[in-house]
Amino acid sequence: MHDCSGLGPRSSGAPGRWAKELTRRGYLVMMPDSFTARGVPDGVCVAGPARGIDVSPERRARDAYAALAQLRQRPDVDGRRVGLMGGSHGGSTTLAAMRASGADTGEGFAAAVALYPRCATFRGIVYRPLAPLLILIGDKDDWTPAEECRKLAEAAAGAGHPVALKIYPGAHHSFDSPSPVRYVATRINPSVPGGRGATTGGHPEAWANSIQQVAAFFGRHLAVVPSRTQEKR
């Protein structure tokens, strides 16, 4: 699930990078565009959508389940082994989707990865993911602070719902971006006084390690389930 810049001309470039890495490893990748059809092709990083247009993470979670339903119609997809992944606004969408029931689509996602999501949304709530969940975030993130994700993971683990968390020292928001680190004063940011301004940009070491983390995580949780016949051999 893409970030607040969408998949249009203002895209951060991170979704495309991940698509290449995952397809290299044999995964089929679907990237739903939640913004263009709703009239916000330039994203919602700086200006929110017009009144009546809902592109919240909770609404986009429904997009994720719609994509899951489409994937399950393909003969080359094992519907039991579909993962969900998103960054920033898409990471928050991933958290919302992994907490929402997708009962109308059958079984839900088998595993999910949320990159630098807004964990503060679930402050004061014990987060219970519907499937194994991995969160990757930088400790220099001033847009979606890592400390909130640490609290979410600790509360979930304390309730018997472990959430895997990896925090990268020195990494900012969008550490998987090909762009250099920069501060943009106009970005909507509920995490700072005044509600504007955030730092984003790539961190080569965090990016390289995150590829390993995601590959290993999906490798464990989306692995082929042997049939009973195979198990007896």
What are these regions (language model features)?
Residues 23-24, 98, 157:
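Gly/Ala-rich phosphate-binding loop of Rossmann-like dinucleotide-binding domains
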Residues 31-32, 86, 165:
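Hydrophobic residues in well-ordered beta-strands that form the structural core
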Residues 17, 21-24, 59, 63-66, ...:
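Extracytoplasmic/secreted proteins, especially bacterial periplasmic and envelope-associated proteins
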Residues 27, 76-77, 161:
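Short phosphate-binding/catalytic loops that engage adenosine nucleotides
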Residues 6-11, 54-130, 142:
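Primarily recognizes the serine-hydrolase "nucleophile elbow" in alpha/beta-hydrolase
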Residues 162-233:
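C-terminal catalytic histidine-bearing segment of alpha/beta-hydrolase fold enzymes
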Residues 106, 110-170:
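The feature captures the conserved acid-bearing segment of alpha/beta-hydrolase catalytic domains
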Residues 1-73, 179-200:
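Serine-hydrolase catalytic machinery in alpha/beta-hydrolase-like enzymes
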